């Protein structure tokens, strides 16, 4: 008799996705991050749900309600810091997941890749709006600065900003709608993640060699379920350590000061995971140019399949491309550092050079290196 997991309409989907899924036998731990991102998403939705039970999205009480959660709600401090640091863990996994895709040529699955880029945008939007909710100084001024960027759009910019604000400044209407969007977006992210998986399972996973693995597949369970559980345990250990030992390590002290429209903080900066994009934005003196560079810094990922000039899919056997890839990683770390620094010499010029290098590497140097490697191999 056939097992129920292979016949039942719902169980069949789970079976084909997580149990009997044919998986390449040689995928490394870099392939763990998909499942880790799923765990992060579930964790964020659950902790967020419990926070929403106690949070009030009103300018007069938002800051106090977060304080109330931390002081008076049973394990409220734990839920709050799991949610805040869970976002950091989410982005660490996201960046590593995207980096893996770039290194091993996973972007050649175009539908999967493009939905992944949309997911990145959606998660970034969710995180930005979530950062506004505690209504501290950095929440308020971050919201003011970032929403104001839309005023750079010619003709409709100013009207668009006021429409998003729901008034002439960031106020009660803004906070309420940001809470509404912050609540709904994770469910949209979940749906997109489902579509992401759907397209991935149409082609099957890529593998480190970049070659077809049709001749050597193994079932996902038990081999990769146990491997994913190990990855999950390591991630949960790291997150728990962060939450229980130094929960404010990645936060901004200014956010413990209630929002005050009359007092601008000396250095307005977003959370650490947006600093690279913020540095690119600031490196261009023109407002519209900066906004376009900011958007294109993420959107450029969608061009990766078109910029792939190598005859090999993966970078595993391409040393020149490997060097450029790690230069790109170093450049992104430099941009992250610069994004958190004040706008003064020498940080301005370092940021401008790092921004130029970022786009030059992706659009010119990496495709050129791939062509050079093809010639060296006489392909």
UniProtKB/Swiss-Prot annotation:
The keyword Methyltransferase does not apply. It is a multi-pass membrane protein. Disulfide bonds: none annotated. A ubiquinone binds at residue 201. It holds the Pfam family Cytochrom_B_C. The keyword Electron transport applies. The cytochrome bc1 complex contains 11 subunits: 3 respiratory subunits (MT-CYB, CYC1 and UQCRFS1), 2 core proteins (UQCRC1 and UQCRC2) and 6 low-molecular weight proteins (UQCRH/QCR6, UQCRB/QCR7, UQCRQ/QCR8, UQCR10/QCR9, UQCR11/QCR10 and a cleavage product of UQCRFS1). This cytochrome bc1 complex then forms a dimer. Belongs to the cytochrome b family. This is Cytochrome b. It comes from Scapanus latimanus (Broad-footed mole).
């Amino acid at each position: 008799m056939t097992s129920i997991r292979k016949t039942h309409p719902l169980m069949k989907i789970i079976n084909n996705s997580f149990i009997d899924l044919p998986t390449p036998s040689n995928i490394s731990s870099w392939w763990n991050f998909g499942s880790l991102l799923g765990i992060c998403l579930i964790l964020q939705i659950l902790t967020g749900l419990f926070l929403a039970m106690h949070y009030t999205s009103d300018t007069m009480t938002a800051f106090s309600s977060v304080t109330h959660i931390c002081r008076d709600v049973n394990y409220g401090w734990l839920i709050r810091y799991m949610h805040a640091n869970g976002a950091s863990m989410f982005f660490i996994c996201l960046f590593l997941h995207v980096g893996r895709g770039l290194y091993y040529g996973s972007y050649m699955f175009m539908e999967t890749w493009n939905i992944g880029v949309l997911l990145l945008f959606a998660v970034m939007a969710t995180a930005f709006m979530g950062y506004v909710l505690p209504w501290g100084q950095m929440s308020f001024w971050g919201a003011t600065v970032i929403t104001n960027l839309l005023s750079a759009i010619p003709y409709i910019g100013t009207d668009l900003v006021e429409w998003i604000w729901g008034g002439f400044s960031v106020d009660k209407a803004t906070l309420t709608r940001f809470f509404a969007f912050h609540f709904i977006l994770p469910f949209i992210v979940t749906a997109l993640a489902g579509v992401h998986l759907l397209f991935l399972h149409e082609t099957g996973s890529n593998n480190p060699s970049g070659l077809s693995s049709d001749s050597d597949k193994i079932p996902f369970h038990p081999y990769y379920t146990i491997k994913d559980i190990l990855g999950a345990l390591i991630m949960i250990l790291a997150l728990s350590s962060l939450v229980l030992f130094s929960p404010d390590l990645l936060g901004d002290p200014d956010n413990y000061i209630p929002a005050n429209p009359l007092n601008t903080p000396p250095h307005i900066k977003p959370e650490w995971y947006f600093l690279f994009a913020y540095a690119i934005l600031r490196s261009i003196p023109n407002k519209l140019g900066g906004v376009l560079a900011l958007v294109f810094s993420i959107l450029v990922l969608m061009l990766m399949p078109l910029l792939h000039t190598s005859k090999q899919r993966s970078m595993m056997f391409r040393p020149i491309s490997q060097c450029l890839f790690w230069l790109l990683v170093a450049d992104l770390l430099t941009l992250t550092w610069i994004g958190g620094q004040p706008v003064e010499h020498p940080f301005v010029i370092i940021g401008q050079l790092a921004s130029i290098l970022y786009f030059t590497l992706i659009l010119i140097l990496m495709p050129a290196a791939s062509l050079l490697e093809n010639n060296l191999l006489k392909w």
